[in-house]
Regions:
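Serine-hydrolase catalytic-loop signature spanning alpha/beta hydrolases and amidase-signature enzymes
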Residues: 109-119, 130
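Catalytic active-site module of serine/aspartate enzymes centered on a nucleophile-bearing elbow/loop
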Residues: 335-379
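Alpha/beta-hydrolase active-site loop signature
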Residues: 111, 135-139, 202, 345-348
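Flexible "cap/lid" subdomain of the alpha/beta-hydrolase fold that forms the substrate-access gate
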Residues: 147-155, 161, 167, 172, ...
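Alpha/beta-hydrolase fold catalytic core
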Residues: 2-104, 126-129, 159-161, 165-167, ...
Length: 379
């Protein structure tokens, strides 16, 4: 059975930020673009915010060592040295674990880290055992000089589930982490009991073919093929330098957060500091040229057609990159799903954490714990 509902924050948090009282007017909302997929060019250049997010080593100036509260949610304490580390294929992988109970595994988006779940981990840990890990190449995990593709992170999370979690769990992912969650669920059907997607990356086959045709003339024909690797490195080196500037990161974040109250120094610095890693530039180059330009190899319909567990779609409808049409299409394709509309942008878990936590906890109690008779969520 599929279910759909709309959750919005309280009137105050919907219209005003926790530290700002600027209303969000309809005209602002109308200016957002509702696209069904992330444009690879936009993601590589504008979204390069996060491409430099590869290893946070400094200490943000704003957060204290203790967890703080926002919108009723405790915030995970920032630790410049990280929390826990696990060795995977010779690489150091960073992760956080909090709470007890049914495990939840949180997977961040492109260029982010476990700290993007700062307002979710402790709240969810009041009822569940919550894991959040940094994907290889991002956050506190090693900046491995390997050939990156979607299956690298699928293999990483799959092994993390087997070696660290070791029991049935629900996997939750945002953006790139969402598509990774789907591929992990397909590969581990006996261990993944449910999947929750927050503005997931990924394309349907028809969209992928159409985009490939467009990019054959725009990117491949006129840029990629004629340009030699050295020139690519020069251009991407400049983009990397530009992307890691705090002012640029803040600007891009504000373009995908409708309520920008949570675009604070903590978040900006957690993305800008990673660029200090010696391998950051090379990882950026490999991600831009080898991963982002080959996303069409993996499609949502091919993955969803093999998945068997319940699916929750927590969707920021005002996302300028991945609009609500994508969520509706996924829901129509995969019938064992529930859709929750959120008045937020691309990162609803950080923009409206209270609404996300409530919706996720409700689904976990009503659907995952009772798979034989899922209920329609009402708000």
């Amino acid at each position: 059975m599929s279910a759909s509902c709309t959750i919005t924050p309280s009137p105050r948090t919907e219209l005003f930020g926790s530290s700002s009282k600027r209303p969000i007017f309809p005209s602002q909302i109308c200016r957002t673009r509702n696209k069904c997929e992330i444009s690879r060019r936009d993601f590589a250049v504008r979204g390069g915010i996060v491409a430099s997010g590869v290893s946070v080593m400094g200490t943000p100036s704003s957060p204290s060592a203790a967890s703080q509260s926002l919108q009723g949610n405790d915030r995970l304490a920032y630790k410049p040295e990280g929390y826990n580390f696990w060795e995977w294929r010779g690489h150091k992988i960073h992760y956080v674990v909090q709470g007890e109970g049914l495990p939840l595994v949180l997977i961040h988006g492109f260029g982010a880290s476990v700290f993007h779940w700062r307002y979710n981990i402790l709240e969810l840990a009041k009822k569940y055992k919550v894991y959040a890990l940094d994907l290889l190449g991002f956050g506190w995990s090693d900046k491995a000089l390997i050939e990156y593709d979607a299956m690298v992170w699928t293999d990483q999370v799959t092994d993390f589930m087997k070696e660290i979690v070791k029991e049935p769990a629900v996997v939750v992912g945002n953006s790139l982490g969402g598509f990774t969650a789907l591929t992990v669920a397909v590969g581990l059907p006996e261990q993944v009991t449910g999947v929750a997607l927050l503005n997931s990356a990924g394309q349907f086959a028809a969209e992928s073919r159409k985009r490939e045709e467009a990019e054959e003339t725009v990117i491949t024909k006129f840029i990629v093929k004629p340009v030699k690797e050295m020139f690519q490195r020069v251009v991407l080196g400049f983009l990397f330098w530009q992307a890691k500037q705090p002012s640029r990161i803040e600007s891009v974040l504000k373009s995908v957060y409708i309520n920008t109250a949570n675009v604070d120094d903590y978040l900006v610095q957690s993305i800008s500091k990673p660029a200090t890693d010696p391998n950051a530039g090379e990882v950026y180059y490999r991600l831009m040229t080898r991963f982002l330009m080959n996303q069409s190899r993996y499609t949502l319909d091919s993955v969803l057609s093999k998945m068997t567990c319940p699916l929750l779609l927590l969707w920021g409808d005002l996302d300028p990159w991945v609009g609500p049409a994508k969520a509706e299409k996924i829901k129509a394709f995969y019938t064992n799903s529930s859709l929750v509309h959120l008045q937020a942008g691309h990162c609803p878990h950080d923009e409206v954490p209270e609404a996300v936590n409530i919706a996720l906890l409700d689904w976990l109690s009503n659907v995952v714990s009772k798979p034989s008779s899922p209920e329609v969520m009402e708000v």
